């Protein structure tokens, strides 16, 4: 008997889109273990595996670029436009190739966070396309002016054809989507006992004096770590492998741990903030 198949297409911009979609896919696996999950993204497999505990197919494809950034704060509009233009010049080939993949693998539903081309691909294959996000890329690119006008129009044409939008909290209106349902926050759940993790990481500071520093998959080029020396009675946690060796800075280097796993140890999170980090912190309040 054929397994129901869900194809999840994610913008490969940072880690946030992959994380929140992986959280949804994980819940689908819990509720409907017979569903086959296909994760279509250039995000690394180790990231997906940190949220998806059961087997899935990782298809390394990209249908958009999000925003090209040097780090979590510095955006490169020129490089973004160049890469988007290249993708849309290949649009017909991308749609043909991936819609064939959907048909050949008997995919039942496409869930997109939130590449617009995924809608066109799904409909070419004759299956519905649902989107999930708190913003659309048209919302981001529109303020970047005339150079992006053609791309914005193409994105909005596809978004307007989506069968359903699952609109996350903290959202822009997303009025281009004709059918919307507001949903709750996405995010992972901590997987380790708080006291065990505190001992494992050597955290001795109380929770109200422990801060998680996290800047998503794109990181930050120049985190002023030296400033932490002014707070010797505070403990800071970071996943940055380039972080210096400071007495009050703990580097979490084991990939088994995710930011959400160490949040229960912390009274504060210092971030940019990205949606997934912010959502996971809010879910733990």
Give residue ranges: language-model regions:
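A donor-sugar binding/catalytic signature common to diverse glycosyltransferases
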Residues: 109-114, 258-285
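Donor-nucleotide binding loops and adjacent catalytic segments primarily
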Residues: 25, 188, 192-268, 278
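A nucleotide-sugar donor-handling region in carbohydrate enzymes
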Residues: 141-220
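Conserved nucleotide-sugar phosphate-binding/catalytic loop shared by glycosyltransferases and other
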Residues: 30, 34-89
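Short, polar loop motifs at secondary-structure junctions
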Residues: 41-46, 114-116, 167-173, 217, ...
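Short amphipathic alpha-helix
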Residues: 18-29
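Conserved nucleotide-sugar donor-interacting segment of glycosyltransferase catalytic cores
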Residues: 97-156
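Nucleotide-activated donor-dependent transferases that construct or modify glycoconjugates
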Residues: 2-14
């Amino acid at each position: 008997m054929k397994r129901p198949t869900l194809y999840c297409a994610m913008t490969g911009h940072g880690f946030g889109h992959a994380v929140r979609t992986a959280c949804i896919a994980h819940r689908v696996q819990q509720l409907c273990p017979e569903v086959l999950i296909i994760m279509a993204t250039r995000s690394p497999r180790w990231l997906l595996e940190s949220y998806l505990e059961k087997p899935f197919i990782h298809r390394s494809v990209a249908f958009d670029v999000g925003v090209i950034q040097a780090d979590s704060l510095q955006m490169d509009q020129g490089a973004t436009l160049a890469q988007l233009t290249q993708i849309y010049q290949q649009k017909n080939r991308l749609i043909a190739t991936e819609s064939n993949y959907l048909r050949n693998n008997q995919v039942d539903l496409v869930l997109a966070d939130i590449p617009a081309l995924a809608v066109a691909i799904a409909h070419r294959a004759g299956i519905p396309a649902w989107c999930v996000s708190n913003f659309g890329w048209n919302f981001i690119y529109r303020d970047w002016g005339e150079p992006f006008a053609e791309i914005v129009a193409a994105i909005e044409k596809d978004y307007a054809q989506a069968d359903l939008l699952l609109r996350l909290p903290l959202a822009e209106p997303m009025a281009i989507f004709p059918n919307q349902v507001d949903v709750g926050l996405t995010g992972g759940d901590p997987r380790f006992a708080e006291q065990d993790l505190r001992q494992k990481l050597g955290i001795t500071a109380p929770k109200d004096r422990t801060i998680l520093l996290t800047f998503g998959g794109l990181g930050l080029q120049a985190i002023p770590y030296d400033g932490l020396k002014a707070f010797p009675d505070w403990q800071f946690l970071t996943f940055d492998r380039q972080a210096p060796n400071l007495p009050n800075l703990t580097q979490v280097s084991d990939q088994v741990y995710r930011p959400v796993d160490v949040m229960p140890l912390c009274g504060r999170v210092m971030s940019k903030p990205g949606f997934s980090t912010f959502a996971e912190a809010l879910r733990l309040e």
